[in-house]
């Protein structure tokens, strides 16, 4: 999700002059809060906010992206992976946050820890894809960076 919009604004710093950022958050109460900060930046008119269920919104966006930053509901990470890989341009980059999940994916995962199982499945699925080249960086809670072939 977008939460406060901080990551969105950081990513905007590296955006090309003709680029746009699409950001999705399920919490409509944060929309105005985010928009206030987006509009204060020089990128406000190039940040497009979507409010609602990200899985549904992704289906409605018929665009290709150079970069996708995934930091969403962990229980759906493998579903997100299937939806967003097709939205990446060739040589597009997928950055996924929280892929170490407080180190839980490195230990034995209990049957009732569904979020950890999902993150583990996401990591394994991403690693097995022939159309993606991936590196996992053990920084804080883990970040994976993948390039679409």
Per-region residue spans from a language model:
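S-adenosylmethionine/decaboxylated-SAM
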Residues: 1-149
């Amino acid at each position: 999700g977008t939460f406060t919009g901080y990551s969105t604004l950081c990513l905007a710093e590296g955006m090309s002059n003709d680029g746009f950022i699409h950001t999705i958050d399920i919490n409509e109460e944060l929309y105005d809060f985010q928009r206030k900060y987006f509009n204060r930046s020089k990128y406000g008119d190039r940040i497009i906010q979507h409010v609602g269920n990200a899985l549904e919104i992704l289906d409605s966006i018929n665009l290709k992206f150079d970069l996708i930053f995934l930091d969403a509901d962990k229980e759906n990470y493998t579903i997100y992976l299937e939806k967003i890989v097709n939205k990446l341009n060739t040589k597009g980059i997928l950055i996924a946050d929280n892929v170490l999940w407080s180190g839980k994916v490195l230990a034995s995962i209990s049957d009732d820890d569904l979020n950890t199982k999902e993150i583990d499945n996401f990591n394994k699925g991403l690693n097995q894809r022939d159309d993606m080249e991936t590196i996992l960086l053990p920084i804080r809670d883990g970040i994976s960076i993948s390039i679409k072939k």
